[in-house]
Regions:
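Terminal transmembrane helical module of multi-pass membrane proteins
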Residues: 171-213
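Short, intrinsically disordered or compositionally biased N-terminal tails of bacterial proteins
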Residues: 1-17
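Membrane-helix boundary/juxtamembrane motif in polytopic membrane proteins
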Residues: 132-156, 206-213
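Individual transmembrane alpha-helix segments
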Residues: 87-118
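Transmembrane alpha-helical segments of integral membrane proteins
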Residues: 162-170
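Alpha-helical transmembrane segments of integral membrane proteins, especially early/N-terminal helices
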Residues: 65-86, 113-115, 146-153
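Membrane-helix exit/juxtamembrane interface segments
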Residues: 44-72
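Alpha-helical transmembrane segments and their helix-start/interface "positive-inside/aromatic belt" motifs
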Residues: 22-43
């Protein structure tokens, strides 16, 4: 019996270190927040870059062309590439010569970066919200249930958009890597959905217990 109590105490201590105040969840929320800010900046900056290059192409202007370049020639891996029938783009970081993004200037490229960027921004933002909620004393709440639900719904919406962009817009054959990446996202969504149900049960039991008291 003493050994049983000892094991229970260890589990309780480990549980307190994972969730609750001054726990692993609290510091994990900081990491998610930093990553969210980093990714969100890139998504917004890339969108601005695509907008400026598109306007420059249509109006034949060179507005901020040193930072947001689009043309038929590009320096790719230290080698100059020129194709009069193809457009390339290169985005640099603000006030810097450091390249941020380089590639083929196509609709598929734009949609891919936009869809993936927005998804990861949402994923990291709700990862931050969920971790922050888990760092509180009362982890069974409507708040965390809502965050988890939004997270797995976002993944289920993202996967078909991701596949459509690659197969239909980018005209890339459905490959094994696309299948496994899509399967991984869906698997995470299923885990999040089951976790949501677990927290729903916990919240219901907690509410019933509060009413009894």
């Amino acid at each position: 019996y003493d050994k049983y109590l000892y094991i229970c105490d260890i589990i309780k201590i480990l549980n307190m270190k994972i969730i609750g105040k001054n726990s692993f969840a609290k510091y994990l929320s900081y990491l998610f927040l930093i990553l969210f800010i980093f990714i969100a900046f890139h998504v917004i900056y890339e969108f601005i870059g695509f907008a400026i290059t598109y306007i420059n192409l249509k109006t034949n202007n060179n507005f901020l062309s040193e930072t947001f370049y689009v043309g038929h020639s590009i320096d790719w891996g230290g080698k100059a590439v020129t194709n009069p029938n193809h457009l390339f783009f290169r985005f640099k970081y603000p006030f810097s010569d450091q390249q941020m993004l380089t590639g083929n200037y196509t609709l598929g490229t734009f949609f891919n970066h936009t869809i993936v960027g927005i998804f990861w921004s949402i994923f990291l933002f709700y990862g931050y919200k969920i971790s922050k909620a888990l760092s509180k004393e009362d982890i069974f709440s409507k708040e965390i249930i809502r965050f988890l639900k939004t997270l797995y719904i976002s993944i289920f919406v993202f996967v078909p958009l991701y596949i459509i962009n690659w197969v239909i817009i980018s005209k890339t054959p459905f490959s094994g890597s696309l299948f496994f990446s899509s399967f991984t996202y869906i698997f995470i969504a299923i885990i999040a959905a089951f976790t949501t149900e677990f927290f729903k049960k916990g919240y219901k039991l907690q509410s019933e217990n509060d009413l009894t008291i």
